[in-house]
Every structure is written in structure tokens, then in C-alpha cells.
Amino acid sequence: MVGSPRAPLLLLASLIVALALALAVSPAAAQGPRKGRLLGGLMEADVNEEGVQEALSFAVSEFNKRSNDAYQSRVVRVVRARKQVVSGMNYFLDVELGRTTCTKSQANLDSCPFHNQPHLKREKLCSFQVYVVPWMNTINLVKFSCQD
């Protein structure tokens, strides 16, 4: 007696239905979709988080190295901080930078006051993307752009 050619298809369909039912009643499905979380998607980040602070400090340092300005800039305020888990971490930082009275030869940027004279005072809105791979001890400024 030869088996029906539809038997393997029927068995496969039964397995698919059983798997779909099992997934539908699993505890993870019962919790519903997570709001605001997409694997590999952008998430809002706490500005005070250690990783954000490290990325911010690196971004400003690189900005100052690449700038042709005789004076250094530092953060006035962080407008927005986001992060993205990849094979490491991408940080997307929107930052308002202000021109300080410190020249590039001065080391401690944190204690540098901002220029208050109108002809020397400059503020920029900058967007930075910083890529960090902690286990490889690497950090890179992927891209940045600024507007006066």
C-alpha cells in the first residue's frame, strides 16, 4: 500500500499550526509588544549615563582638535541623547556648544568660562555620532555637523 502524497504536507501544516498556537500562548506573547524598544533601534539615553558622558567628552575633544578656531568650545547643554545597540554602541548626540576664553594650548576645558563679549561669543548646534566598542577599547567619531 502506497502512502498518500498529501501526508507529508498535512503533517507539515499540522506542525506549523501547533507552533503558531504555542507562540501565541507563550508568556512573552502574553506581555504584548514592548513599547519604544526595537532591537537595534534608537533609544533615548540618559545624559548622566557613563557611556553618554564618555561619548560626549570624546566628541567635544575631537571637535576642538578639528576646529580651526583659536579658542576651544565646550558643552552649553545637551539637547538630545540617543543610543543604538549594534556590534558595540552608537551614540547620537545633539549638543549646543559655546566658545570659551581658553585657547587650544590650555588643558582643563571644564574650568574655561564662555566668552561674553558679543564679537567673540559664538554658539553652535552640533550633531555627533560616536561609535564605542568597550571590549575592544575603541571609540570613534563617525560623523558630525554643526550650525551657527
Curated annotation (Swiss-Prot):
The signal peptide here is 1-30
User: Residues bearing Pyrrolidone carboxylic acid?
Assistant: Q31
- List the record's Gene Ontology CC terms alphabetically: cytoplasm; extracellular space; vesicle
Task: Give the main localization category.
Answer: secreted
Taxonomically, the superkingdom here is Eukaryota
Location comes to: Secreted
Gene Ontology MF annotations: cysteine-type endopeptidase inhibitor activity
Q: Disulfide bond: is it a keyword of this entry?
A: yes
* Disulfide topology: C102-C112, C126-C146
- Entry keywords, A to Z: Disulfide bond, Protease inhibitor, Pyrrolidone carboxylic acid, Secreted, Signal, Thiol protease inhibitor
Site (Reactive site) found at G40
Q: Where is this motif: Secondary area of contact?
A: 84-88
Q: Which SMART domains match?
A: CY
Q: Which family, according to UniProt?
A: Belongs to the cystatin family.
Annotated PANTHER family: CYSTATIN
- Function, as annotated: This is a thiol proteinase inhibitor.
Q: What is this protein called?
A: Cystatin-C
State the encoding gene: CST3
